Amino acid sequence: MNRTLTRDQVLALAEHIENAELDVHDIPKVTNDYPDMTFADAYDVQWEIRRRKEARGNKVVGLKMGLTSWAKMAQMGVETPIYGFLVDYFSVPDGGVVDTSKLIHPKIEAEISFVTKAPLHGPGCHIGQVLAATDFVIPTVEVIDSRYENFKFDLISVVADNASSTRFITGGQMANVADLDLRTLGVVMEKNGEVVELGAGAAVLGHPASSVAMLANLLAERGEHIPAGSFIMTGGITAAVPVAPGDNITVRYQGLCSVSARFI
């Protein structure tokens, strides 16, 4: 993989971006200072942020996919989605409270998450292998929060920023993947009692399981895989909706439960 950053530059950028998250302040996108950064560089920075969190005692509890719309990929001129990691303090219970004082400019997306019962290895992982390896799926609302000024960034910068990961809210109802048609599963997002977004599972690469397969193949490029028991958020079914203190959100999943949270 093509790289342009030295190890010291990777370490410095990881500290810079993570400090923006922890200290709750925005920063210019990193490609302003490093215009020749590559995807390999960006993932090196992301994995170093992960290492920093684990060294601090945080536990990695899942993975997430981003840029999982074919239209969005075409718009950005890329052929694959991106991924990030989730740590323990990102998790919020259904009906719980999200403290916006710890976030910069949060937005929410409706997603379907997979939990695996068998490992998945790339390259060449496909949707059939994912479905066979799935223990259950669970409705999830992701809170994204770019550390970059005005939520404006390029693809390299957002990969380095752990794909804008910050919080996630899981519903209480698990479902067998064989009992659902995830392509046509409908989603209604409400904010303060008003419908703000509608979507269906096919918005995620035609089928959310395709997102998991792509994750396995992306991880294989770094010699990694998806272990059994992994929690994976597959990407936004809806567009991202800004939230602010005082907002109450509910996302209703067809044939499943709803997921709610309050922002303070």
Swiss-Prot record:
Its EC number is 4.1.1.77. Belongs to the hydratase/decarboxylase family. This is 4-oxalocrotonate decarboxylase. Pathway: Aromatic compound metabolism; benzoate degradation via hydroxylation. GO terms for molecular function: 2-oxopent-4-enoate hydratase activity; 4-oxalocrotonate decarboxylase activity. It catalyses: (3E)-2-oxohex-3-enedioate + H(+) = 2-oxopent-4-enoate + CO2. InterPro entries: 4-oxalocrotonate_decarboxylase, Fumarylacetoacetase_C_sf, Hydratase-Decarb/MhpD_sf. SUPFAM superfamilies: FAH. GO terms for cellular component: cytoplasm. The keyword Acetylation does not apply. One of its GO terms (biological process) is benzoate catabolic process via hydroxylation. Keywords: Aromatic hydrocarbons catabolism, Lyase, Plasmid.
